[in-house]
């Protein structure tokens, strides 16, 4: 069934971006926004050979005349019709493959509802006729990508953050914590604090500019209060940014105030714990005998962990929370933006994994429930 000459497809569907490619590659071939757009009014797009929907970058570029929807909210698929469109676009337009010819590895959020896994399985076999498929937990793939099987992953993307303790390759569900604070909340916050400076960013197009400012200029301060004092006393932390229209804006303490919300969610008016405390709480829900292994293998994953300075700050904050004798190590691989996908690429190309796929035959015999017996 799974011959070596047929590469498996690896598709990591995030709330913000979809990453897709071939098992064995070291990076995804296609990375595009997880959005589906439909025309707001019939007949606006004259002579364009009007399509009833657009996906990804094309939807983004035509957003003026479309209604945009994100089918994945907080990491969980909520709109299956649109999700099917994204998968269709992934296979046929981005990767240009026939899904009925390749095993497909999909990723899922931690604590994904059972019904969702079944639905994913059903769509792969019934709509796309895949010969085989598998569903893996995102954080587990990230830890594989870091060359480990035990540790705790802080996976923070665009729509949601999770802390996932993993022991010998298995996620420990009772200790997984979810924090609904991630990249898109930080963009909202940066838009707000830039407005306080007198720059107005309100439209979706301007939101993309703010996303770019966030990705290029923001960083995490080691000591927030001290950094605020430095920013107030001198201009050493100021950076200028050129807007598409040529106007140049200056951004100062916003550079580190924006990601500080990860450590102090009260900045966003949220009552939840910061990411450092969430990691600690997650570890404390685990058996006392494995905690030392988790502290020593704390792996960062996802685009929202890409800020310069975040690993040092995590080290400092968790050291302050943990027992004083414990060794704490924060692992922040440079490719962590794509580590879920990379872990999937590694897993799907292992010879030992080939018997783990759910085959079409098994699906036909057992139905969608097979996913709970074979993917855990």
Swiss-Prot record:
Pfam families: Actin (PF00022)
Modification after translation (UniProt): Oxidation of Met-45 to form methionine sulfoxide promotes actin filament depolymerization. Methionine sulfoxide is produced stereospecifically, but it is not known whether the (S)-S-oxide or the (R)-S-oxide is produced.
Subcellular location: Cytoplasm, Cytoskeleton
Modified-residue entries (N-acetylaspartate), positions: 3
Residue ranges of the propeptide: 1-2
GO cellular component terms attached to this protein's record: cytoplasm; cytoskeleton
Source domain of life: Eukaryota
SMART domains membership: ACTIN (SM00268)
CDD domains linked: ASKHA_NBD_actin
Molecular-function GO term, any one: ATP binding
Chemical reaction(s) catalysed: ATP + H2O = ADP + phosphate + H(+)
Note: There are at least 4 actin isoforms expressed during artemia development.
Similarity remark: Belongs to the actin family.
General function of this protein: Actins are highly conserved proteins that are involved in various types of cell motility and are ubiquitously expressed in all eukaryotic cells. Multiple isoforms are involved in various cellular functions such as cytoskeleton structure, cell mobility, chromosome movement and muscle contraction.
Protein name according to UniProt: Actin, clone 211
């Amino acid at each position: 069934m799974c011959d070596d000459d047929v590469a498996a497809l690896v598709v990591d569907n995030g709330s913000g971006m979809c990453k897709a490619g071939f098992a064995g590659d070291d990076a995804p071939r296609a990375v595009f926004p997880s959005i589906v757009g439909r025309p707001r009014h019939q007949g606006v797009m004259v002579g364009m050979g009007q399509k009833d929907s657009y996906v990804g970058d094309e939807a983004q570029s035509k957003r003026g005349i479309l209604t945009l929807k994100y089918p994945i909210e907080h990491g969980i698929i909520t709109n299956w019709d649109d999700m099917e469109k994204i998968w269709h676009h992934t296979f046929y337009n981005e990767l240009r493959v026939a899904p009925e010819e390749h095993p497909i590895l999909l990723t899922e959020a931690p604590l994904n509802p059972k019904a969702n896994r079944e639905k994913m399985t059903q769509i792969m076999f019934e709509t796309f006729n895949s010969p085989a498929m598998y569903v893996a937990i995102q954080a587990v793939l990230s830890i594989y990508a870091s060359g480990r099987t035990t540790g705790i992953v802080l996976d923070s993307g665009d729509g949601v953050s999770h802390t996932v303790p993993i022991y010998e390759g298995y996620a420990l569900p009772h200790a997984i914590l979810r924090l609904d604070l991630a990249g898109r909340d930080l963009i909202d916050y940066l838009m707000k604090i830039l407005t306080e400076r007198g720059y107005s960013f309100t439209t979706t197009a301007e939101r993309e500019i703010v996303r770019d400012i966030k990705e290029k200029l923001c960083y995490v301060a080691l000591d927030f209060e001290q950094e605020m004092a430095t920013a107030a006393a001198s201009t050493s932390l100021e950076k200028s940014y050129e807007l598409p229209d040529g106007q140049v804006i200056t951004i100062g303490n916003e550079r580190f105030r924006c990601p500080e919300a990860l450590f102090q969610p009260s900045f966003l008016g949220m009552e939840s714990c910061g990411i450092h405390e969430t990691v600690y709480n997650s570890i404390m829900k685990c058996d006392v005998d494995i905690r030392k292994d988790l502290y020593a293998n704390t792996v960062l994953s996802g685009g929202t962990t890409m800020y310069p300075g975040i690993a040092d700050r995590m080290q400092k904050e968790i050291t302050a929370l943990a027992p004083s004798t414990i060794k704490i190590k924060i692992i922040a691989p440079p490719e962590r933006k794509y580590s879920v996908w990379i872990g999937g690429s590694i897993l799907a190309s292992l010879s030992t994994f080939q018997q783990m796929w759910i085959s079409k035959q098994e699906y036909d015999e057992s139905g969608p429930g097979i996913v709970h017996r074979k993917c855990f």
